[in-house]
């Protein structure tokens, strides 16, 4: 559909959204159009009104979707109709007035130090043709707090080994510098010399991307998530675990060891300090330690 193609071009060129974000937006619009087709005779997105939106919202809530999923769908459709209004294709945005009740922010899940040690033990003891790559990925993600998507886009020219800093291209093409430590430095240099260069030579690749798949082509975000899930499985950690927890763990470790909120905001690449404030929680151990230390009736008789 020409309308969707124009919106895709707008998201990609003007908004400079990532391919993953653009795909998610288009999928949400497609799902809405399918809903309209399945539930009535209205198939033209230009004719949608508030009644259609209300019916769709009821449908989403009836499916017991997570509030974050519903919010994402509404955001995509609101952006789509703003684009249509901007280009005089519709008069009003039917999603403009949709408001979801604010949900209290959930504390981010993170790995405790003991759990991180289990992850590193698992990846260092593993076998495989690209073991060094996997080690470097874990060291870089935990050592810098960068997003998985940022890690996938990393190029060697972004890394300054002498200053031990990485130039990260974040959301909205915003650049930031993040430092990295000795473990990440050694892992990257070892990987480059003993895996990356031989792989590129073997498969006759000439790009500059740091992390590669088994054909020496730039790895995808999905590829990194798969590797991390394999490491998590090998570590025998239980519970609901997601690779993004490495980023949460990085922020938590900094704050628990005395870093100020502004510094953590800069390192994570958050545009707003309020986004970073969710990390001001402390670990249970820290909470108990402070309680025992400062509350007069905390000790046993």
UniProtKB/Swiss-Prot annotation:
Localization annotation: Cytoplasm
A GO CC annotation recorded here is:
cytoplasm
Cytoplasm: is it a keyword of this entry?
A: yes
Residues the record marks as active site: 147, 171, 244, 247, 270, 279
Cell division found in the keyword field: yes
Q: Which residues form the Core-binding (CB) domain?
A: 1-85
What the entry lists under InterPro entries is as follows: CB, DNA_brk_join_enz, Integrase-like_cat_sf, Integrase_catalytic, Integrase_recombinase_N, Integrase_SAM-like_N, Recomb_XerC, Tyrosine_recombinase_XerC/XerD
- Which Pfam families does the entry mention? Phage_int_SAM_1 (PF02899), Phage_integrase (PF00589)
Q: Name one GO biological process term.
A: chromosome segregation
Q: What's the family?
A: Belongs to the 'phage' integrase family. XerC subfamily.
Q: Output the PANTHER family linked to this UniProt entry.
A: PHAGE INTEGRASE-RELATED (PTHR30349), TYROSINE RECOMBINASE XERC (PTHR30349:SF77)
The UniProt function text for this chain reads: Site-specific tyrosine recombinase, which acts by catalyzing the cutting and rejoining of the recombining DNA molecules. The XerC-XerD complex is essential to convert dimers of the bacterial chromosome into monomers to permit their segregation at cell division. It also contributes to the segregational stability of plasmids.
Recorded protein name is Tyrosine recombinase XerC
Q: Which gene encodes it?
A: xerC
């Amino acid at each position: 559909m020409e309308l969707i193609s124009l919106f895709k071009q707008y998201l990609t060129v003007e908004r400079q959204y990532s391919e993953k974000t653009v795909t998610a937006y288009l999928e949400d619009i497609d799902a809405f159009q399918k809903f309209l087709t399945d539930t009535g005779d209205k198939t033209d997105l230009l004719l949608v009104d508030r009644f259609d939106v209300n019916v769709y919202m009821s449908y989403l809530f009836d499916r017991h979707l997570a509030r974050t999923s519903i919010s994402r769908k509404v955001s995509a459709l609101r952006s789509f109709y703003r684009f249509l209004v901007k280009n005089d294709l519709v008069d009003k945005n039917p999603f403009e007035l949709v408001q979801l009740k604010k949900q209290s922010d959930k504390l981010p899940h993170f790995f405790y130090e003991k759990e991180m040690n289990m992850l590193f033990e698992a990846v260092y003891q593993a076998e495989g043709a690209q073991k060094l790559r996997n080690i470097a990925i874990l060291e870089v993600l935990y050592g810098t707090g960068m997003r998985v998507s940022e890690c996938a886009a990393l190029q060697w020219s972004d890394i300054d080994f002498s200053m031990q800093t990485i130039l990260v291209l974040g959301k909205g093409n915003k650049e930031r510098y993040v430092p990295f430590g000795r473990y990440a430095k050694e892992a990257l240099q070892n990987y480059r010399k003993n895996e990356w260069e031989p792989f590129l030579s073997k498969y006759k690749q000439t790009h500059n991307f740091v992390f590669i798949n088994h054909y020496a082509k730039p790895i995808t975000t999905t590829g990194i998530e798969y590797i991390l899930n394999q490491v998590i499985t090998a570590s025998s950690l239980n519970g609901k675990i997601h690779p993004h927890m490495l980023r949460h763990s990085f922020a938590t470790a900094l704050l628990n060891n005395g870093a100020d909120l502004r510094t953590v905001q800069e390192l994570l690449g958050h545009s707003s300090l309020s986004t970073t404030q969710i990390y001001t929680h402390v670990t249970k151990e820290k909470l108990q330690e402070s309680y025992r230390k400062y509350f007069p009736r905390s000790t046993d008789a």
